[in-house]
Every structure is written in structure tokens, then in C-alpha cells.
């Protein structure tokens, strides 16, 4: 573990040196280069109640001190109407063993009436709360819609409308346990390439993913007086064919869609943020490691096939002065399918953000996560956590 941590730190330091070197060479390159970053450590006391198959409660509690995965360094580069952004994070909080994470890498062209973005960035429907538990999780997996970052082509117009074409998702029939599934007879030379959906090797039995279009998001962002708001729709479609002994044994067509809306109301010194969504097969659309198991398409003959999700969250903020801000919020999401129990979950938090200096913040927080019941009707864990985020940024 120590060796891996050192590698993370060395990568972040290396990225900082690269940014600094580019900054020193700005005159020769005729570029505007702005490095930035944030280093975050969290200390938490976490207590959980979980259940055995008989439904009896069990308990555990622990203290942790660790680097947050969303610690990052990056730089912005601009030349005329073109700009770019590159950002590296310490690690993916849901996949630490993968090491240093590319958080963002994209270029933008400002063509006057709007901007064209090409690269790797968060999904347009991401809208976060101020919750810091789970590496600034912001209700991740609890009605927040955060699903990571994807290769995309995004057109944003000055009138507020945007269209994003993104890498499509291809979750297997086992749901959350089969994310990013390739066609199994793609061949060793292609299994880890962007073309791993295409069959290239004969097998008597295989699973074939047929993809036809990018994940597509159409939305709008606007402002009216004290209200900043947005919303839109997203969709994804693919097929899964299963073959055994040269005979097709299954064919599933998976349609996923999402409708979302959010708003922020500035009532200084108060502010209100709200977000809501409804979806079909949301897990297949987003492929989120934090998604509820009940949000995925299922071909189980004992139940329906499509999962239906609705959820949302609300947050109240108060600015006491230029050093102290306070936030509290609650989230709820329900995932339903005919013939089974609803897979619901909720979360709540309250925190205080204190700016010790311009570049140093501490954020104490209390958080509560309740997984309620699974799609199988069994009781799931409840988590109580209190802790502090220690953040230095530049």
C-alpha cells in the first residue's frame, strides 16, 4: 500500500512539474497557460449497521485517514479561439487499484455562436450537491446522476441549448456486475480496443453486443433572475445476443432513457439547489459503479425486463460571511420493476465549510446513507459518518 501511495504522489508531483514547465515556456509558445490543483485529505469516523440473511442487525465502526481520490492537478491552455484542459486525479475512488486517473482531457473551439468540445469530460447531466462523504461524493449513486467521465463531442450554443454525443454504454445481462462488457469473441487483438464490440474470432458459444449509436444527450442551461436552471433528455440503445453450441439462445434489446432537471435559487445569504430525474434502465445508461443494482435491465423471466427509476435531491445553503458557509441536504431514489421489491435508497448530510485562508479549507460534516431494501426484499446497510475534509488548493 505504501508503494502504491508513493506512485500516486509521484504522478501528481510529475504532473505539477509539467504544468510549471509549460508555464515557464509561455512566451515561446504564445499560449496562455494556467495551472491549478487541489490536494485533499479526509478523516472519518464511520459506523455501519448491516444484516445477515435472517435480518439480524450487525454493527461495525472504524476511523480512517486517507488521501481523497479527487485530489488533482491540471492546467488550462488558450490560444485565440481555441482552448484545452488537462487534469489528473490521485485515483478513481471506486477503483483505487487502477492508479492515477485521467479526470479530463479536451479541447474547445469558440466559433462565435457557441463552442465545440472534443475530448474526455463529465456527462452533461452531472449536477452535484456539497456533500463531501465518499471523496466529495455529492450524493453520487443517491439521485445525483454522477457517472464519471466519457469521450464525447459536445456542441454548446450561446442560446443555452447543447447536444452531446458520448461513448455508448454496454452493460451485460448481469447488471452492475457486468459493466463495460465486450463481445466475447472479439479476439485477443481487439478485446481492449474501442472496437471490442465487433466479432472477429469464431466460437461455438459467445455473447455479442451490437451497438448502433452514441449515447446522446440534448439539454438546455439558462438563467432567469435569481434562478439558474437546466434540464434535458438522454438516451442509449444496444442489443445483446447470446449463442451456445452455434444456436442463438437469447436476444435482448436494451433501451435506456433519462429525463433530468435541476435549479439553483440565489436568495443571498441563502441558496437552494434542487435536482430530479426519471429514467428507464438508468444503470445501463450511466454504467455507474455506485448505481443501485435495481436500476439495470434484467432478462429474468420471473420479473419484468425494464427497470424504472425516479429520484431527486434538495439542498439548503447559508453564507455567514466570507469565511463560513453551511449546507444541508437530503436525497432519495427508487428503482422499480414489475414482479419484484422496489430497490430504494436515501442519503442526508450537513456540513460547514470554513476558509482558514484563501488556499486552505476545512469542512466538518455529518452524513447518513441508508440502502433500505434490495430488489430481493432484503434489508441493506445503514451508514453514519462524521469527519473532516482538509483541502489545500491553488
Which residues are covered by each model-predicted region?
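Residues that define the transmembrane beta-barrel architecture of outer-membrane proteins
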Residues: 61-71, 99-103, 146-151, 210-216, ...
